Amino acid sequence: MASAYILIKTLPGHERDVYYKCFYIPEVCEAHPLVGEYSLIVKIKTDAYDTLGYIAADKIGKVGNITAAEILPVLDDSSMHQRLETPLQSVH
């Protein structure tokens, strides 16, 4: 399973319609409005890393009223998950 976060900038006043259009794309598992440089963050999941770009460009990119997007692929490494489960030591 491959996943990525996509930071999306929209035309002013179109945040809501872009949000709803993205939300109904089957590969989108999360969508959240943001305050700041980007209007939305969307999380997508697919079976393979090589299809992440297709979903970002051909599905989300064609939603309309998007001025820019940045895709951030997630690196899923089971050893990383194991390390993160270890409690952090306090630093003195």
Task: Please place each PLM-identified region on the residue numbering.
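A compositional/biophysical signature of low hydrophobicity enriched in polar/charged and small residues
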Residues: 1-92
